[in-house]
């Protein structure tokens, strides 16, 4: 007979950011434990609130499944003596398995005969196994742990109660001097201590005590309440999914309420108000026809009793926040950009890389060199120079000091206020983009250039002085910034290689008297290459194709992506296989070529090598122009024209001919062909055969 099982871990309030992952761990580890222990069940459901993590297993079998297990013994030559009798080794083996020599069978493994027995393993009663569940609870990991009292266990928050039940029976075990029972606790203020009669009653029992244990149910309830408020008040309440998930993990029984603030605060930039509401107070901002309104929606952890009082209390808290923001805003606007720029000279960016003022000066030089490479118009270059020059001034403002997440956004607002060109102001905002993998890219070429210059300065500078990310440690966010640069290069389709960018940055650092460590150039190239590999994998491209186009040289990021896509498509084209094989024949031989000889037409001896050389000359200029203009599809098609002549050449000629001049001439031809193929991709790295 199957029975339901419930495990609940009662805790002091967990940080919201830990809850989803902890619940997932509990669910996954439970499923894994059931599978490993051969325990059947109908379903597994996990729960989480700020004060509890729980898992419910429906219709868990009362006994493990019994199995028949084959056990390998010694080799037959050891198990039997010369007379064919079982030796002590065989007898000891079977006895150890609780069997006799009558149960032995012989099987051959890799040409050697071994003795085997089939052992019946009876399933254990579930009551014997369930106390092992303690190890699952103890194995849950969190972003940060703590100890409490004299306990040795480390956990996100102290464990205050444990529920462990199979049917109406308590499963006995203890963690941190807390013993399991069938008693749980409702809402901290509205609920009470309650005894669970059966695991299946868990959800209802807690709901009756003002706890909604399913996170998704709380989320749905919040969304429904927001929709109701929209209808009642004519509001628009944009639902930020990240904020919604955080709020649902802050409450056990959500009740939404409307608060308001003075309209005068709407004079403050809306980004400041929204940040204050969302990031600091976890409120949902309210709009009408896309315009921010002097209202907000909060979510209470409780019912609607005295909800008006709750709203007023929250209004008071927000009012204090907004009063501070208004003060900072007005104070900042009484200053000037030069005032804030001067402060940058006193703030260290990195000990070996100087102040923020030093960084800005390098950014200007890097941005100007990039602009030159891109042949940008003179007016755009002037805007880029100014944007780079004042890109960091807002870091010194009171507003950004209070709302650090608004750096760039405040820079744009203030730059406009202080009379800067709108393109300059926009670039100040955009140069921080993208801040993360899902963030928007800069919308203008000016913003893109300044963004790349900023991030390139940070990456090259840190690696130049030995601050290379290791493992999960990346305090300067270099990996994220490298990915951001690659995304911008791909999006803008600039005819600019990563190697050229690195050369620009290191040249600027050398002229700025920054001591650069040995092999910095190589480390930077490899650092960017690994980020490109990561991004290409994220786009669903195969690893071997990625390495084929990036291992030689990362080069132009957009072109590398396009080549990888083209080669990935060709993997599924049967007609491309002989083309790939021909090009690889050339590359395989090129490893053995050590010659700087030029091809001599008078030493082309056979018809097939003359045809190959002629075809090489025919396509060379066209192919190189196609690569130069990033025409990857056409370039590969042009390269494919060499396939038939290459096969004929290898089939009809001995490359390593006895005649040294003939040999060197053929090797020179191989080198020339290699110099065409490798700039596209090292096709040797692609495992084509697995596709056909």
Swiss-Prot record:
Main location class: cytoplasm
Keyword Cytoplasm: yes
Reaction(s) this enzyme catalyzes, per UniProt: tRNA(Gly) + glycine + ATP = glycyl-tRNA(Gly) + AMP + diphosphate
Top-level taxonomic group: Bacteria
Subcellular location: Cytoplasm
Keyword check for Mitochondrion: no
Name under which the protein is recorded: Glycine--tRNA ligase beta subunit
Subunit architecture: Tetramer of two alpha and two beta subunits.
Biological process according to GO: arginyl-tRNA aminoacylation; glycyl-tRNA aminoacylation
Family affiliation: Belongs to the class-II aminoacyl-tRNA synthetase family.
Pfam families: DALR_1, tRNA_synt_2f
Assigned EC number: 6.1.1.14
Keyword annotations from UniProtKB, A to Z: Aminoacyl-tRNA synthetase, ATP-binding, Cytoplasm, Ligase, Nucleotide-binding, Protein biosynthesis
Recorded GO MF terms: arginine-tRNA ligase activity; ATP binding; glycine-tRNA ligase activity
Enzyme category, top tier: ligase
UniProt-listed InterPro entries: DALR_anticod-bd (IPR008909), Gly-tRNA-synth_bsu (IPR015944), Gly-tRNA-synth_heterodimer (IPR006194)
Disulphide bridges, residue numbers: none
A GO CC annotation given for this chain: cytosol
């Amino acid at each position: 007979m199957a029975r339901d099982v419930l495990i609940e871990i009662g805790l002091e309030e967990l940080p919201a950011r830990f809850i989803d992952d902890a619940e997932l761990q509990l669910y996954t580890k439970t499923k894994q434990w059931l599978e490993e222990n051969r325990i059947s069940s109908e379903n597994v459901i996990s729960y989480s609130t700020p004060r509890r993590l729980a898992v419910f297993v429906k219709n868990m079998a009362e006994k493990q499944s019994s199995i028949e297990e084959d056990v390998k013994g010694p080799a037959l030559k050891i198990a039997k003596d010369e007379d064919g009798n079982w030796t002590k080794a065989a007898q000891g083996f079977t006895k150890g398995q609780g069997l006799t020599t009558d149960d032995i069978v012989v099987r051959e493994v890799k040409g050697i005969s071994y003795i085997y027995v089939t052992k019946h393993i009876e399933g254990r009663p579930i009551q014997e196994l369930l106390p092992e569940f303690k190890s699952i609870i103890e194995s849950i990991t969190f972003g940060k742990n703590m100890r409490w009292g004299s306990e040795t266990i480390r956990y996100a928050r102290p464990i205050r109660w444990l529920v462990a039940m199979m049917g109406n029976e308590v499963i006995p075990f203890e963690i941190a001097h807390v013993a399991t029972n069938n008693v749980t606790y409702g809402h901290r203020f509205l609920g009470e201590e309650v005894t669970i009669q059966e695991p299946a009653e868990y959800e209802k029992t807690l709901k009756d005590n003002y706890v909604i244990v399913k996170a998704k149910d709380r989320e749905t309830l919040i969304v429904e309440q927001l929709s109701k408020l929209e209808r009642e008040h004519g509001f628009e309440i944009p639902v930020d999914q990240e904020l919604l998930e955080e709020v649902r993990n802050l409450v056990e029984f959500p009740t939404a309420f409307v608060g308001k603030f003075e309209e005068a605060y709407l004079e403050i930039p809306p980004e400041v108000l929204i940040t204050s509401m969302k990031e600091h107070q976890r409120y949902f901002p309210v709009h009408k026809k896309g315009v921010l309104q002097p209202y907000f929606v909060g979510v209470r952890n409780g019912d609607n009793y005295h909800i008006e009082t709750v709203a007023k209390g929250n209004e008071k808290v927000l009012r204090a926040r907004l009063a501070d923001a208004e003060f900072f805003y007005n104070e900042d606007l009484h200053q000037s950009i030069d005032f804030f720029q001067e402060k940058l000279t006193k703030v260290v960016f990195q000990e070996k890389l100087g102040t923020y003022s030093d960084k800005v000066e390098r950014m200007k030089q890097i941005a100007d060199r990039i602009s030159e490479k891109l042949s940008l118009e003179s007016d755009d270059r002037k805007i880029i120079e100014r944007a780079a020059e004042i890109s960091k001034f807002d870091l010194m403002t009171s507003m950004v000091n209070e709302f650090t997440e608004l750096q760039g956004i405040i820079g744009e607002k203030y730059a406009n206020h202080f009379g800067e060109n709108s393109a300059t102001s926009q670039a100040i905002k955009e140069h921080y983009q993208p801040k993360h993998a899902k963030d928007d890219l800069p919308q203008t070429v000016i913003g893109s250039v300044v963004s790349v210059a900023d991030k390139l300065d940070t990456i090259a500078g840190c690696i130049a002085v030995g601050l290379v990310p290791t493992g999960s440690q990346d305090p300067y966010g270099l990996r994220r910034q490298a990915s951001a640069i690659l995304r911008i290069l791909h999006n803008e389709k600039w005819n600019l290689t990563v190697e050229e960018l690195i050369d620009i940055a290191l040249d600027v650092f050398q002229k700025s008297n920054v001591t650069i460590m040995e092999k910095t150039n190589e480390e930077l190239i490899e650092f960017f290459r690994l980020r490109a590999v990561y991004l290409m994998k994220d786009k669903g491209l195969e690893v071997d194709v990625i390495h084929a186009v990036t291992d030689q040289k990362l080069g132009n990021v957009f072109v590398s992506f396009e080549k990888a896509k083209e080669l990935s498509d060709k993997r599924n084209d049967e007609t491309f296989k002989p083309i790939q094989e021909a090009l690889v024949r050339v590359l395989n031989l090129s490893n053995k070529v050590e010659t700087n000889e030029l091809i001599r037409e008078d030493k082309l001896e056979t018809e097939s090598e003359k045809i190959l050389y002629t075809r090489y000359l025919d396509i060379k200029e066209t192919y190189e122009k196609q690569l130069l203009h990033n025409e990857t599809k056409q370039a590969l098609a042009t390269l494919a024209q060499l396939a038939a002549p290459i096969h004929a050449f290898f089939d009809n000629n001995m490359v390593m001919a006895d005649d040294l001049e003939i040999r060197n001439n053929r090797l020179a031809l191989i080198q020339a062909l290699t110099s065409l193929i490798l700039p596209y991709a090292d096709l040797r790295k692609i495992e084509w055969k697995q596709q056909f």
